[in-house]
């Protein structure tokens, strides 16, 4: 209570503490009072305490309750208690002290009503009283105290506690609890003290119960009792507890315990974990408590750990504490020094050594000099990563310790100088060396000689040389070499350095200008000599930068074995010159002439030449500046005149701010993306940077160029402003001339300063820094200089010299660079005069204001907005000769029929520019009548139609349409809306079209009609490939009367490099046919660069066209195509061309020495390139051979027919112009992919014998032999052709960036197939989204709808159309299957009429098995061949002229190779690919099946063979996979089980093949084992899965299986499998009104009414076997027929067998029920019938059903319980219940021999969810596998056989469910409600097992009065 109030508080505090000190202090704290050693004897005087306390209480009662009275009472109470408790005999009488505390507590409790808590001493006295009593109890054992003492104490304590509780004081609660339980008898406490593991919750509960104070008492008591381990355990738990807020006391107790345990490695590690500051606090506390020894042990231990771990945290404080404690405990100085030496040995840092030296000097002074020197030596020897400053401090320390030893001081100073060379250090070293030497006095030396020698050796270890025998001059020279980095040689120093200034000047002059010529050497020498003479007098010592640079480069002379600096190599070589012969000191070559020797020596020099003053020299000597500007601003004025002249000569070559003023770029702050095909515009530069990094990383040449130009920017060293080029920087640096070059560029503040620091200080004083753009008129202001520089850079970017070639967006600020770039595109005219555009600057300047008067237009274009040549008529990027223009004008007046206008030809100046991105009209920016303005950033490609522009308005040039619009945007909307057939922008990335430059001549041309020709297609069957095709435009001129208007032909642009390459190659083979004036290429396109601007070559080729008359006929271009060499070398100057890519690859490798990796990165090798194109079906091939084979096989083109076609076509060349109708027909035929390309005709194809297009002529002269191949199905062959052309025009999609489109239905080719829904979409994604959102389709059903949509789009292109014959239905289909499905879905056509519908198409190819009694029929020969090899063992050579027909989803394509078929299935029918060609993961995807017991040929009769044959014939219908021909013998199940380990902890899968002993853990592993080891195919594994995969689970007991009893079971199971063979039932017309879901069920054809009912579960079909069978219709009529039946020797009782229902995604019904978790899709009633009956009608033969029937299923519909008709297992179950009521005694007829063995399925338990599971009963005498009762339900279910439900068939007769409900209600008392829910949600789970309870089974079934029972009554 030292913190109490006033004197009274102090007295009370003393008194409160006194009981603990007096009673427990004299007694408890002594070790003699430890429990068991304290005598128990009564002590006199305790009786006098009661009256004293009563008197105090009486006095208190007489007074009013106040703070003063309470304070007085507490003071008197403490004094009285101290008087009695401090009796000198009290410590020997525990009973006496216990009585004292009892009375004191009782008295205080009775006085509590008269005390107030406003007095702080009240609670304080009570708390101290409780603690003192508890401390006494810790030392007393209950057994030591007599009952007459202990019991009254407990009773009094409880009464006092109750009294205090009335006033809210529960201080006695802990004491009462402890005394009742026993002070040391708490079970948790006992566990802790016995060091047993304790739960954290229990520890926290104990801590919360007793509190920190009581626990501290316990720990102190344990320490006093020397119970160190117990105290350690308790204190550690308290220190780590989160229940105690302040754990410092417990931490200290824990550390104290650890110190008591030393030496102990674990204790040392625990101490080392504590933070150093906490350790220091604990040391201080221990010292204050008088525990110096513990504090010293702790300090020594922690300091040792710090020294060993090199930790310097609080190292000085720790070392100081240690020294004080060491000296206090052991005053001996020698011991202290020895300990310091020991610490120095283990120290690893110099900081620790310094701390030790300091405490030694403090404690020992001169006596510790030797140890201090020893520690210094140790510090010098440490090779740590500490800085050199610390070692210099060590040297200074040594010099201070030994001030009289001159040699040591010299060594220390030299070491310090060598570590940190400085002029001051050199001066001090010089002073020491100038002092006279001293002789070492060994006798009077302060340190031993050995230690001194060790010190000198440690110092010399830091020297790069050994100056022991050097004089001061030599050492001084070496020191000067080191000082050369920061100091120069003075005049005095140079005298000893043998270096003349003339030699160095000659050397520097030579190093600077040797490579540029020697004509100015004399001038350079004189100039530099003068400069150095002027500066030499002013130089202080160590101020030359030249010498510092020289010292960095040295060479080793082989002649004199010395090292010299390279700057003196010539001077050094003179030493070795003899008889006029020069010897190279580096390579010892000899030269007779100096002119040859000097250049040779310079080759060895690595030092860079000094070019400090080159710019001044060159200006004076050469008159031109090519170097950098002088660094000093003062050197600039004298060059201003030359710079100005220079700038005048260069200014016209660069874009400058003065030229930007005329471009109307003011107040524009937009950043368009420079990337190819990207028209994004950003309002901030940072977003452009992010966009470039994300979208145009490494594959965009234009983006790379932009970044390169950005990196070329220069920065001013004075104002940090950025400039576009070095020219702009030089032009700007004139601003910084003068003595104050640093300038503040903020608005209205142009203060100048002489240093950058002054400028920075000035900027800090600015309130608001605002920077304005330098462009006059631009008022945009920035607060950040970086943003300003980006803004100004964009101004230059907008007005730069920009290349306008297609695909090239490169820009330049210099016209020379721009012209050099254009030369890369080979666009120079024949005379090479590319500077015509420069000459036309003046004329173009006059048009600038008219051309560009809206700055926002520049927002969308980065193109040629150069002021000088903005719109030049003969620009370098689109040049046409005058002769060409005149020819075009003449042709417009003539009657020529066709004029070829290429997409990249010279007609680029006639383009119609598409929609602008902004809303400004074109009338403000239109040029004169002779020019067309073309903004370059377009969202859409130009359309291919004729549009006339007369300078003021746009006029539509189509027949009968003369609409006029003011701007291009309105014209484009008109074209999209009114002429959608011709305006067909492809879905390609938005790409900037470059503006065409205007033509000088006023041309009047005819209307151009564009006919796009598809360039390329791919051979891939992927529907996603080939969507984006590049259109080759052929503009055919017609004489239409629009000659007075200038025509503008806009052509579509390709968007990818590979298709552009194809387009360029096509240009080589084009000819200008059907015209009087023909054009031919004067040159060939050979040397194309590989950059992104490949179109530029085509432009240059077209621009060089020379039109001349050609009277002779052109040769066949098809033959020219076949003779072409499309793969050409991309290097400039190399004209090699090759037919194949491989040949080009070898050319690069051998001719140009490219690596293969580098070649594969070239453009030609990056893309799929198919240059050889079929002119009929537009398919492309990579080889000419493939194209010839295609012509021969697909189009039956031979040499005779080709010759005939050529003759006819040549006649057409001279017949004159084609008719307009014919031209339109050709155009629509070329478009070909759009269903609405000709609205009057359903389909339009060019006739092969007519000259429909120029491409027909190309292939008309093929000279290959004719071999007509047998195409069995015209539909199939045409379908393959359609697949090849998929996407050229049929899938029109819209680019993302377009504005609103006004499109009608004809331009939305993706239509919804629902009858009442007229929605149509522009792309497939929109249609799919429509199906899923509007019609609630799920993902699995979209496959069929997608095919329907494609079928509808391909309707126009089909050769043979199947039209629906119903009235008011004009739908047409590609194949008979689609028609049959439509009739069944839409017109309720019964499936009986299906053969009539299917007969229209004729069977493509039906292959019947030729073996007797085998009804199998196949569609493909491979299936028949497979069937013959597997079923009939016919392995002879089977010849085939047949092909593989794809019958999935109604597809009729034919393939001759299996690889092509597999690729087709992967792309077109991907859902079936896994089932047809890839092994499934059986463990995750197959249902639980019943076990097919091993096949034994002897026990199986003819019936089993028939069953196996029928199974095989159906399981391999769609397989097309060959299996192993050799028969494989399998083990029996018993043999397989004996291979397994009986007590294995995991599942086991033994190999069932005879002779193989493999046992694996996973099902996938055994499947892989069969495939790899036994070469089994996937189809065979699927068939034999249950025989081959046997799962032995954990805990399975392996027992003997009696073979004699297993055989009947095998036989019966096989018989039941045979009986469950699939049958197809006829559906009566009367049932057609009710939708029927696809089910696969079988019923016995005959029912014996007298036969006794028996419930019997049998084997369920293999899920994959069912998967290949087709959908079946369930009907309970008597007309049931079976195509294949098995003869059963012993007919078993009637049994209902169920087959699994394939769910909509093709898997088994295990996942079928899982799909119910999704929302049930809504579907119309007609569509429900459509789905259900469509699969019925597609079944042509029961033995061959296309795979599609298992994928496309009807929608899961809501289930009406009234219409529920149980069948299969449910039916038999109900029937069994009903019969059991009538014939209860029939159960006696059950025979155990007919019970099948328990199925051991290998499926995982995950597939069990939602399945009907039937578990066959196990015979007692024939158990195969015993299931432990402890196994979980999932483990039991894994061994059960799955029987999927069949509950959706709807008929009129509905049996009652009451019996079933009653049975469930009575038998399943605990789960009846759950069972009803399962039935309600169509997910019943019924498990039949052997009864495990004693209740007779008859008692479970209802009585006759079932109506009286209610569901759920139990």
UniProtKB/Swiss-Prot annotation:
Residues 1629-1642, 1731-1741, 1796-1807 have a biased composition (Polar residues). Residues 1252-1263 have a biased composition (Acidic residues). The keyword Nucleus applies. Residues 521-541, 882-907, 993-1028, 1231-1290, 1620-1654, 1725-1757, 1783-1807 are annotated as: Disordered. Disulfide bonds: none annotated. One of its GO terms (biological process) is regulation of transcription by RNA polymerase II. Its main location: nucleus. Widely expressed in fetal and adult tissues. PROSITE patterns: ZINC_FINGER_C2H2_1 (PS00028), ZINC_FINGER_C2H2_2 (PS50157). There is a cross-link at residues 622, 839, 1423, 1599, 1611, 1696, 1762 (Glycyl lysine isopeptide (Lys-Gly) (interchain with G-Cter in SUMO2)). It is found in: Nucleus. A zinc finger (C2H2-type) spans 582-604, 671-696, 714-736, 742-766, 771-795, 801-825, 954-979, 1127-1152, 1172-1195, 1310-1335, 1362-1387, 1407-1432, 1444-1469, 1549-1574. One of its GO terms (cellular component) is nucleus. In some small cell lung carcinoma (SCLC) cell lines, there is an intrachromosomal rearrangements at 1p32 fusing the first exon of the RLF gene with L-myc. Interacts with RIT1 and RIT2. This is Zinc finger protein Rlf. It comes from Homo sapiens (Human). The lineage of its organism: Eukaryota, Metazoa, Chordata, Craniata, Vertebrata.
